[in-house]
Amino acid sequence: MAAPGLRLGAGRLFEMPAVLERLSRYNSTSQAFAEVLRLPKQQLRKLLYPLQEVERFLAPYGRQDLHLRIFDPSPEDIARADNIFTATERNRIDYVSSAVRIDHAPDLPRPEVCFIGRSNVGKSSLIKALFSLAPEVEVRVSKKPGHTKKMNFFKVGKHFTVVDMPGYGFRAPEDFVDMVETYLKERRNLKRTFLLVDSVVGIQKTDNIAIEMCEEFALPYVIVLTKIDKSSKGHLLKQVLQIQKFVNMKTQGCFPQLFPVSAVTFSGIHLLRCFIASVTGSLD
């Protein structure tokens, strides 16, 4: 299911040298993105398109069941998305409030995206990485699983709201199911749910519960593979193949393309920012 403004390029792989050349010619207003463009090409490729390494392994086999480049943003859109995530006087990025029940949630007119996942999957770390261009925004990160106990709302200018949901599984809040299920079912301005899966261990039983919830409510959602810095290329390839097969055969509402990311190396963060900006209509 494609949201307004989502650019789809079915089956077309990036011509990486051409893309990098276009990126180098693009003048972004984001100083951080300008610094990214000065990286060596191989490092830049890994940072912006982490699935490129997987593509190289799969190309000889002609795997048509994989959807590695459906979301096909232009270099200009990647830079524009970075600008949207950059805090300025005109583009305020702030923590809004927290809530334990949907009727306590702030009534915000903007499009909304939420992040859910198992305890200790790296959810808060990922959100902190997304907001790295707005360093004044405080996203609390803890090494202890189950640190997030409430729904935390962050506004990104006048564009959209990001919601950090409590983790499920170990040390989850007692009212987790009621809290999250009610939010997913009743939040009318929710545009996309981002389901985080640990790339080291893959989809777990508790993840299946969250997936079933999204499917039951007919919600558009996407799987984000976290902690790819802790996975070898071979292990990441194995997880991508297994999860892609699961998405193709077992889901209806899941976006076909996976998004591997690392909150440590920032690999995949720029592309994920662009996807968020796209599904919320912020690039229109």
From Swiss-Prot:
Domain EngB-type G: 109-282
InterPro entries in UniProt: EngB_GTPase, G_ENGB_dom, GTP-bd, GTP-bd_ribosome_bio_YsxC, P-loop_NTPase
Molecular functions per Gene Ontology: GTP binding; metal ion binding
The keyword Ion transport is annotated on this UniProt entry: no
Any single Gene Ontology cellular-component annotation: mitochondrion
SUPFAM superfamilies the record matches: P-loop containing nucleoside triphosphate hydrolases
Keyword terms of this UniProt record: GTP-binding, Magnesium, Metal-binding, Nucleotide-binding
UniProt KW Transit peptide keyword: no
Residues engaged in binding GTP: 117-124, 146-150, 164-167, 226-229, 261-263
Residues given in the record as Mg(2+) binding sites: S124, T148
Domain of life: Eukaryota
CC cofactor: Mg(2+)
Annotated family: Belongs to the TRAFAC class TrmE-Era-EngA-EngB-Septin-like GTPase superfamily. EngB GTPase family.
Name this polypeptide is given: GTP-binding protein 8
